[in-house]
Structure formats: C-alpha cells, structure tokens
Amino acid sequence: MWFDWILKRKNFLYLLKQIQIKNQQTLRPDFYSIVDVLGIVYFIIFYLIANSIARKNESNQLYKKYFVKGFYYKMIGSLGFYIIYAFYYRGGDSCTYFINGVVFNEYMLFQDFADGIRVIFSNITGVDNLPSWISNQSVYVYGEGYILRDTKALLVARISSLISLFCFNSYLVTCMAFGFLSYLAIFKLFSLFCRFYPSRVDGLSFAFLKVPSFIFWGSSVNKDTICVAMLCVLFYSFHKLFIEFKLYPKYLIALIISTYLVFSIKSYIVTSALPGLLMFAFVNYQNKVLSGALRRLFAPLMIAVGLLTFFLLYQSLSQTFTEFSEESLAVRAEGFKSDHMNIQERSGGSGYSLGDNIDYSPLTIVKKAPLALTIALFGPFPWQVRNVVMLLSSM
C-alpha cells in the first residue's frame, strides 16, 4: 500500500517536472511555472486550517479578532515576495535555497532514495560530503553552487527541500508554506505577550502581525523566516518550561530544536537572546518571592547580571568559535558593506556607509551604533529611491 502510494507520487512529481521542462523556453521553470496554479488550492487549505484554529479557540478574543486577519497579511507577504523575487529580481538567495532544495528532492525521488534521506536529514558540513549528482545539478541550476559550500545556507536548503516536497516543488507554494508555518509560531508568542500586557494588545498586534517589512521578510524561503519562527518557539517553550513550570516533553523538544536551528543559521541571535531570557526568568522569580522594596533593589542587580552574562558568553564563544572573534566579525561587516555597495552600483540597490577605515573596536561600535540602527530600521530613505521596489521598501 505504502509502496504504491510512493510510486504514484513519484510518477506525479515526474509529470510535473516534465511540464516545467516544456515551459523552459518561455519561463524560468526553477522560479515559476504552471505548477504554481496549485497556490490557489494551498491558499484554500491554509485558510481552512487557520479558520479551524480560530474556531477552536473562539473563546479567546485574540484568536477571534486577529488570527484570520494576520493569516491574510502573511499570505499577502508571501505572494509579494514571490512576485518580486521571481519576476523582478529573477533570483536571489531565497530562490537559490529553493532550487537546491528541489535538487535534493529530485535526488531522493529519482536517483537514490536512501542516500537522499541521508542528505536531507544528516548534518552535512560541506559540498565534499554531498553526492556528485547533487553538486553537478546545483552548479548547473544556479551559478557557482555557492550555497553548497555554506553550511548555514545548506541547512536552509535542506529545510526548504522538506517543505517543497509537499508543495510539488512550486516556489510560490513553498513561500506560502513557509509563511503559514512561521505565522503559527509568531501568533503563539503574540498571544503570550498579550497576557503580559493586556492593555497594549493593539500595539502588540501591529508589532507582531502588521509591520510590512516584518511580514515581507518573514513569509518566504529564507533564513529570516526560519529564525523568526524558531525564536518565537524558543521564547514560548522557555516560558512554559521555566516560568510556568509545565515540564512537558513537547516543550523541551521544541526548545532544543528551535535553539539548534537558530544557532546553526544565525548564532548571534541566540547569543543576544540568552541574557534577555535569563533576566526575564529572574524578574519573574523575584516578583513572586520578593516584596516591593526588595524588587527595586534587585532590578539593578539583574541588569548587571544580564550584561555580565552577555559579556562572558561572548568571550567564551569568541574563543570557541572563530566566527565570534573580533577579526571575523570585522571581516564579515566589511563583506556586507562591500556587497551592498556592489548591489547599489550594479543593479540600482541602496547602499550605506558608516565611514572609512573603521577599526570595529568596542568604542567605535558604540559611536556608530545610532547611525547603524537608523539605517537598519528606516533605510532606504526616500532620497535613495531608484526604482519601484526601493520605493515600496522606503514606505
């Protein structure tokens, strides 16, 4: 029974692949094809699931008022991302993650099923540990195959392969699936914060569910979507385990998996979040145990403990992992800067400058922080607009 199902699925996927190949002369089949019409079907499926969740929690006003609306925003974000990257940019990191995920699926379904499972689920550390068929196909479908040489990007491609397998290798549907799955995690953390601040629900709903850039970058096949979703799971499961003391295996498993994925993709996020989590736990404990006067005395101590924890953690990681060393961070910062400047010169993107010959010492970082945060949060600025996409981003 299961063998027949797998065989039929392989035949159907093969048929879809042939349809994509036939459209190769008029379309870019790696990014969009006739298979994307399944997006309508998947939207209905995701809507029915979202509506079912809202009905199941109809006694909760948050789900009743915000859940389905937030779902619509996410789907709009996924569609917008798909349109811009598939039709305007015609590529990018997101498309590359997706393409290599499709290659993994094709290898598993049509070349070597057992080894394909190994490739997708094992901790691959580089292109040398991949089958030559995958390496050759990846180089063919996208430039130099650089994703396969980056362990973090390779993990994103493997996650994409798992999701795109159930989306019939459609980039549109895979973006929608990423957006929907991340939305479930985001709404969990949103509901938790609303318990902390019941008088600020409207503001929290805007921050979690309605900020355009947050929706756009968190609704597609990319690192940000995975990290945001897993960070929400990390915070939520941490609260359940260490604040509410609900010591259930599901929360422990969720905490371990989310921490692993975030640390593997963007390790600095875990480094930054850990002191905040510890302070959050300490504050909750002190509110339960100490009186008002003692709490006021205890607060500065907690801030000092949090800062000390961050400093010690950073020092430890910089010695253990070379990517946290000052030299490595400086090289990466210069790399990001030069990449953005190249994009600005080559394709009319927005660049930035924090000054020349920056030494990246702690004092310099503190001095440059206001300008860097302003650029990160509010750029590109209206006077930097060079095309329609930049105009939308600026708005």
PLM segments and residue spans:
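Juxtamembrane segments of multi-pass membrane glycosylation machinery
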Residues: P29, L130-A177, F378-N387
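Transmembrane-helix motifs of polytopic, lipid-linked glycan transferases
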Residues: I49-A54, S160-L162, T174-F196
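Transmembrane and membrane-interface helices of multi-pass
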Residues: M75, S205-V211
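Extracytoplasmic catalytic/substrate-binding loops of multi-pass membrane glycan-assembly enzymes
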Residues: Y85-N100, L109-Q137, I147-I159, V366-P370, ...
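Membrane-interface alpha helices of multi-pass inner-membrane proteins
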Residues: I215-F216, K250-V270
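Short acidic/glycine- and proline-prone juxtamembrane loop motifs at membrane-interface regions
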Residues: S220-K223
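Alpha-helical transmembrane segments and terminal signal-anchor/GPI-anchor hydrophobic tails
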Residues: F263-M395
